[in-house]
Amino acid sequence: MEALHKKIREEGIVLSDQVLKVDAFLNHQIDPQLMKLIGDEFATLFKDSGITKIVTIEASGIAPAIMTGLNLGVPVIFARKHQSLTLTENLLSATVYSFTKQVESTVAISPRHLTSSDRVLIIDDFLANGKASQALISIIKQAGATVAGLGIVIEKSFQGGRAELDSQGYRVESLARVKSLAGGVVTFIE
């Protein structure tokens, strides 16, 4: 997606060979026009997949997930990282390790929002080692729902997340596939 590539080149900051900072437009400050384009693109890619729900993890996946849900006309559910007094029922949950934050946390969704008849599209800001995606897949399976695909805004292709998801037979659509961050330069798989 050329608009996303351009934004990454202009405003992304390479912090190391492993870490790309995109807080200027995606995971701190949000560019609404770019999110609209991202939602349009994911909706086009998955329009014939029978999606009934979109699932993401708070917080950075919420903006692209909402725009995709708006385009597809389906609800968006975000897995919470922190317990809430309003989440009182037996939750669908999984643990996830954050590569960027270097911490493990439990994410949870109320079972009232996912059913066995749902076809779920996972939307996330990044795909690195695939741990967040695997946690969401686990939660969706706990509900008996079907994972219809994964929409990733930025994939770090040099890490193993996509290979793992591919080997499990999941459809993965990434809007920007980063080949390398070596030398402080973002190189894309075109």
Swiss-Prot record:
SUPFAM superfamilies: PRTase-like
List of residues binding xanthine: 20, 27, 156
EC id: 2.4.2.22
CDD domains, A to Z: PRTases_typeI
Pathway connected to this protein: Purine metabolism; XMP biosynthesis via salvage pathway; XMP from xanthine: step 1/1
Keywords of the record: Cytoplasm, Glycosyltransferase, Purine salvage, Transferase
Localization per record: Cytoplasm
Any Gene Ontology biological process: purine ribonucleoside salvage
One function term, GO molecular function aspect: xanthine phosphoribosyltransferase activity
InterPro entries, A to Z: PRibTrfase_dom, PRTase-like, Pur/Pyrimidine_PRTase, Xanthine_PRibTrfase
Entry keyword ATP-binding: no
Catalytic reactions of this protein: XMP + diphosphate = xanthine + 5-phospho-alpha-D-ribose 1-diphosphate
Bridged cysteine pairs (disulfide): none
UniProt-annotated binding residues for 5-phospho-alpha-D-ribose 1-diphosphate: 128-132
GO cellular component terms attached to this protein's record: cytoplasm
Keyword Cytoplasm: yes
Similarity comment: Belongs to the purine/pyrimidine phosphoribosyltransferase family. Xpt subfamily.
Oligomer and partners: Homodimer.
Biological role stated in the UniProt entry: Converts the preformed base xanthine, a product of nucleic acid breakdown, to xanthosine 5'-monophosphate (XMP), so it can be reused for RNA or DNA synthesis.
Descriptive protein name: Xanthine phosphoribosyltransferase
